[in-house]
């Protein structure tokens, strides 16, 4: 029986991080976690990491699509945060962001790791951006590296 599993180390991987500016006080912590994981655990050099900023989570899929279309990156890490408010806006933004990023991954055969927090409160966002609940940016970055290695093994 053959088992394909992806390692986390991917020193030659070219990674694009697309990050929303809206809720930047949360997103910058996600970015710090992602960069730390890529460099320390994934052994990816600074030269192989590109950070692309966009206005908000709703814009992440279009930016990710253009990054994937460039065919210069092995994986994309999408980072942002959508915090529930008193209107249905949260549902629209979170849903379309999720759907759009998944579509990019399938359309361009490029791993797109979902590091977008969809939370009910600012406290939950803070917990998931590096305090009680770990750093979801770091988790997304490691997921992207693992997918690069899994797909590489499948293709070889």
Curated annotation (Swiss-Prot):
GO cellular component terms, semicolon-separated: cytosol; riboflavin synthase complex
Record field: catalytic activity: (2S)-2-hydroxy-3-oxobutyl phosphate + 5-amino-6-(D-ribitylamino)uracil = 6,7-dimethyl-8-(1-D-ribityl)lumazine + phosphate + 2 H2O + H(+)
Domain of life: Bacteria
EC number, UniProt record: 2.5.1.78
GO molecular function: 6,7-dimethyl-8-ribityllumazine synthase activity
Annotated pathway: Cofactor biosynthesis; riboflavin biosynthesis; riboflavin from 2-hydroxy-3-oxobutyl phosphate and 5-amino-6-(D-ribitylamino)uracil: step 1/2
Enzyme class, spelled out: transferase
Protein's UniProt keywords contain Transferase: yes
Residue numbers binding 5-amino-6-(D-ribitylamino)uracil: 22, 57-59, 81-83, 114
Binding sites annotated in the UniProt record for (2S)-2-hydroxy-3-oxobutyl phosphate: 86-87, 128
GO terms classed as biological process: riboflavin biosynthetic process
Positions annotated as active site in the UniProt record: 89
InterPro entries for this protein: LS, LS/RS, LS/RS_sf
Keyword hit for Transferase: yes
Keywords: Riboflavin biosynthesis, Transferase
Short name of one Pfam family: DMRL_synthase
Reported function: Catalyzes the formation of 6,7-dimethyl-8-ribityllumazine by condensation of 5-amino-6-(D-ribitylamino)uracil with 3,4-dihydroxy-2-butanone 4-phosphate. This is the penultimate step in the biosynthesis of riboflavin.
Self-association and partners: Forms an icosahedral capsid composed of 60 subunits, arranged as a dodecamer of pentamers.
Entry-linked HAMAP family: Lumazine_synth (MF_00178)
UniProt family annotation: Belongs to the DMRL synthase family.
Protein name stated in the entry: 6,7-dimethyl-8-ribityllumazine synthase
Source organism: Photobacterium profundum (strain SS9)
